[in-house]
Regions:
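Hydrophobic core of transmembrane alpha-helices in multi-pass small-molecule transporters
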Residues: 63-70, 77-97
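Juxtamembrane intracellular "pre-TM" segments in multi-pass secondary transporters
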Residues: 171-187
Length: 187
């Protein structure tokens, strides 16, 4: 969910005050990075970390589905505040994914294949974006609220599918020592 484009557009589409759109990027970025300072050491104490990524993906999917409900059922300030509030929780889930991803990838994907994996993921997401773009711009009229709500539902379900796939990864136990509590060390 891109806060600069998708969510900013959604804020306007539901008739929420435009000032809410200005808060989206800082919320997503700080809402993901700051909690990592708190949870990083705790996650590293667990030898198998794929569950944290899966949990983060489930949280993100739930938030995107919540945004779909907000867009469909509310308008104005209520819908805008719901989107912003759900983005806060979404960002916390994103933080779990960020903390766990590199460790799991480092243990499960050979170094020589990591670039290919990232490239494949980028290619598939680009093709999906292209398909949605063709649907959007291939019509004579602007798609309605139902179309955008269904896109959010599809995105939420995709997060849940990703959580299930990631949870099935055969991750071996890793190192649990080292890496202090980042917030304490920063202060």
């Amino acid at each position: 969910i891109n806060p600069k484009t998708v969510l900013a557009w959604l804020i306007g589409a539901v008739g929420a005050p435009g000032a809410l759109a200005g808060a989206l990027v800082p919320i997503r970025e700080s809402g993901s990075l700051i909690p990592q300072l708190l949870i990083g050491a705790w996650v590293r104490r667990h030898p198998v970390r794929k569950g944290f990524w899966a949990l983060g993906a489930v949280i993100q999917g739930l938030c995107v589905l919540g945004m779909a409900l907000a867009v469909w059922h509310w308008e104005g300030l209520a819908a805008g505040l719901a989107i912003v509030g759900l983005l806060v929780v979404f960002s916390l889930g994103r933080g779990f994914c960020s903390v766990a991803m590199k460790d799991v990838q480092g243990k499960c994907i050979p170094k020589s294949r990591r670039g290919r994996l990232t490239g494949l993921a980028s290619t598939l997401s680009g093709l999906a974006t292209l398909a949605v773009g063709l649907v959007l711009f291939g019509q004579d009229s602007e798609p309605g609220l139902l179309f955008y709500t269904l896109l959010l539902v599809a995105a939420g379900l995709a997060w849940w599918l990703a959580a299930a796939v990631f949870a099935s990864v055969d991750e071996y136990q890793g190192e649990t020592a080292g890496g202090g509590h980042a917030l304490r060390e920063a202060l």
